[in-house]
Amino acid sequence: MKLWGGRFEKSTDALVEDFHSSISFDQRLYKQDIQGSIAHARMLGEIGVLTSAEAQQIIEGLKGILTDIREGKIQFEIGAEDIHMNVEKLLTERVGTVGKKVHTGRSRNDQVALDLRLFLREEIDHTQELLIALLRTVLDLAKEHQETYMPGYTHLQKAQPISFAHHMMAYAQMFLRDLGRLKDTRQRLNVSPLGSGALAGTTFPLEREMVAQELGFDGITWNSLDGVSDRDFALEFLSAASILMMHLSRLCEELVLWSTGEFQFVIMDDGYSTGSSIMPQKKNPDVAELVRGKTGRVYGDLVALLTVMKGLPLAYNKDMQEDKEQVFDAVDTIQKSLLVVEPMLRTMKVNKKAMAEGAKGGFTNATDLADYLAKKNVPFREAHEIVGKLVLYCSKRGCGLEDLTLKEFQEHSDVFAEDLFESIGIEYCVRQRHIPGGPSPESVAQAILWTEHILEQFTGG
């Protein structure tokens, strides 16, 4: 007999039972579901809906179920549909008729909204811990390589010289914003919907704030329809997760490129590489490639839930059963990705020589030469044209700007003087860009300190 079967004259079709059931995946919410039921039962006892003895009997029964699930002693039933009904059925079997009172003043609609918020709050905290560990590794790399010079790119073409530290600090800023998005999401989801009922609250004088406080929420939802019908908190998490995965994917894309024989900027540790079944020489950056590939999976989770929610009238609809698998998948994917990217970064070797050689080619110092002329009162557009012609001149001769003689420079502009050679040295080019946020060692050191300060605010020390 279904716990809701009073108005039905026959049982649900077996095909519908299987199609309708969500226990195969929402059993993952067992801890949150039982936590919520314990807090609800305790509150029912406090307000006199249950006697103290009944409340305690229910609470002890729920604690026993929680222990047995953790120890693998429970076999969930598809016929009981979902985690809520499975737990309530188990409770009634253990404590008798009093177990049927646990659902007083409550609907599965507010129950599942509570469970999902509790789950996401916990997983966001864990995700932040993993992201902070990655961010610290990025900062360590930046500290170590403030004078490791490399080419910066636009359009994947060499553009201007920077330091590897500066490049890493770009990702540090991205990951810092990712932390902020996760923090903001957690703050907005941390309100309790319990007490919203199916959609219109309840006639029982529930102490919603009491339950919210016991479960660690900052407050309660203030509209019962909204409390059960929206999943914007889950969508916000999936959005933050998608952006985080995008940042991880971009980093991994660069590691894949940099580890090629054409770049040789980094050497991936054997522990984070794989071989080929046919080509003995291969060392493939499969971990980085997989993170890049899994990013699309998280995007799909976001789009799937957006699509589920877009046409739903208020309040709860069965479509919303489809919210959990997307959330679970995204949580697992981002956490596993963070777990492998951090040690992959930490163990890779940076080829300083290859980076420095790369910085010297491709006329990365051309902008600095144009700036040299502009500082001598040549209008920048004229300076740009002069240097462009010098680049063409060098390209035809197979040499760099630094290989030209002063006479060759002066054939293009009499403003050039002996001091130009200092201004186009790669190290000088980087060091002169000491504007806040720039690539000079001083600017990067300042950025590292600022980032560490912000990170301390996240970690509380």
Curated annotation (Swiss-Prot):
**Record-level GO cellular component terms:** cytosol
**What's a single GO BP term from this record?**
L-arginine biosynthetic process
Q: What is the protein's major site of localization?
A: cytoplasm
**Disulfide bridge map:** none
Show the Pfam families listed in the entry: ASL_C2 (PF14698), Lyase_1 (PF00206)
Enzyme Commission number(s): 4.3.2.1
User: Which InterPro entries does the record associate with it?
Assistant: Arg_succ_lyase_C, Argininosuccinate_lyase, Fumarase/histidase_N, Fumarate_lyase_CS, Fumarate_lyase_fam, Fumarate_lyase_N, L-Aspartase-like
Q: What domain of life does the native source organism fall in?
A: Bacteria
Sequence similarity: Belongs to the lyase 1 family. Argininosuccinate lyase subfamily.
Name of protein: Argininosuccinate lyase
Q: Which organism is it from?
A: Desulfitobacterium hafniense (strain Y51)
